[in-house]
Amino acid sequence: VLCLLKRTEPALRALIASPDFAVDGFLCPGHVAAILGAEAFRFLPEEYGLPAVVSGFTPGDLVYSISLLVEQCAEKRPALSNTYTRVVRDAGNPAAKAMMDAVLTPCTSTWRGLGEIAGGGFAIREAYAAYDAAKKFGFSPAPAADPPGCGCGHVIRGAAAPEGWPRLGKACAPAARGGAGRGCREGAWGGGWGGGGGGGRA
């Protein structure tokens, strides 16, 4: 197993501490919260005064979650809300968390746009080293360097919108990806392109 798993909380804390941080609130990932629990994001309103809404992924989920987030921002009432209650519990999935704790341990990890984050990833515990591909084959995956002019880090941090990035639709498109952010149809880059089907932007 080549373990490149990431940890959400350290990355969010690093994002908030970045000098160009300009985010008013967070839609928190429902698939992460399904394991860790909605309470894993409680630190956002309590420590940073930032609204946080755990959301699912259907259009209805997203519209409702965004409406709650906007309401919290407008009323200056930061709180943690969970609109994905059909999947996410406050405490998450105890059995899955116990398995993760048994097999994985936090480690320093590199995040695109945020750099190296202490505790930002997971490593396989020594007890399971026989299954760790990096140890078995004696290599350490190095993060790929961003190509010149790559805007992935800026967009991931919320410091720039993909629609205004000069490479979008030119050097950075589904058929000619200019960085990891354009490697999938999800997130801000996918929305900026219009789904990534190659037919142009939304």
Protein language model annotation of sequence segments:
Residues 4-7, 29-32, 56-57, 152-155, ...:
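Fold-independent oxyanion-binding glycine-rich loops
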Residues 140-195:
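Cysteine-cluster motifs in flexible loop/terminal segments that predominantly coordinate metals
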Residues 196-202:
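Compositionally biased, low-complexity flexible segments
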Residues 4-17:
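Short, flexible loop segments at boundaries between secondary-structure elements
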Residues 16-25, 43-47, 144, 157-158, ...:
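Solvent-exposed alpha-helices and their adjacent loops that cap or buttress functional pockets
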Residues 64-154:
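Internal helical hairpin/lid segments
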Residues 2, 20-89:
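A conserved active-site cap/scaffold subdomain adjacent to cofactor or substrate pockets
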Residues 12-13, 38-45, 60-71, 97-101, ...:
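Predominant activation on well-ordered alpha-helical scaffold segments within soluble catalytic domains
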